[in-house]
């Protein structure tokens, strides 16, 4: 596995972990909205930015694949969560498309982080 492929795999795992911490919260569906948060919501864009920045530093070529891998991991984990929750009660996640819109908006700073890493590389040259 090359360094680039390893970074993509780590980016997918980061997306899965972001979903576990901010959406699943290690709680059943009925307790997620009323329970305490593991981290406050404003940490999600910050963590996405940092992950996009750190994982795309040193990658040659197009850096957009790192944030896309983060987003893909986040989407995949949330889709699995929706399927698991709806297996017990089909009325859970009635507004599931909006969950994906929120995920895309909240993790979009990963693209900014990848762009900043490109600017840092240009500045060093």
Provide a role label for each language-model segment.
Residues 91-125:
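Alpha-helical membrane-associated segments of multi-pass integral membrane proteins
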Residues 63-76:
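Central hydrophobic cores of alpha-helical transmembrane segments
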Residues 13, 24, 39-47:
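Short hydrophobic alpha-helical membrane-embedded segments
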Residues 4-22:
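Alpha-helical transmembrane segments
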Residues 44-64:
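Canonical alpha-helical transmembrane segments
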Residues 27-41, 77-102:
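Interfacial non-cytosolic loop connecting adjacent transmembrane helices
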Residues 5, 54-61, 116, 120:
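Structural signal for the C-terminal ends of transmembrane alpha-helices
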Residues 24-27, 67-70, 93:
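Alpha-helical transmembrane segments of multi-pass membrane proteins
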């Amino acid at each position: 596995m090359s360094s680039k492929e390893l970074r993509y795999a780590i980016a997918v795992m980061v997306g899965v972990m972001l979903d576990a911490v901010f959406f699943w919260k290690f709680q059943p569906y009925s307790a997620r909205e009323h329970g305490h948060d593991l981290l406050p919501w404003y940490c999600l864009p910050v963590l996405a930015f940092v992950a996009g920045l750190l994982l795309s530093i040193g990658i040659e070529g197009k850096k957009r694949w790192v944030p896309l891998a983060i987003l893909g991991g986040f989407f995949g984990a949330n889709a699995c969560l929706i399927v698991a929750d709806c297996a017990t009660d089909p009325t859970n996640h009635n507004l599931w498309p909006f969950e994906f819109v929120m995920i895309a908006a909240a993790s979009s700073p990963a693209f900014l982080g990848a762009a900043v890493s490109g600017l840092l590389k240009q500045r060093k040259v």
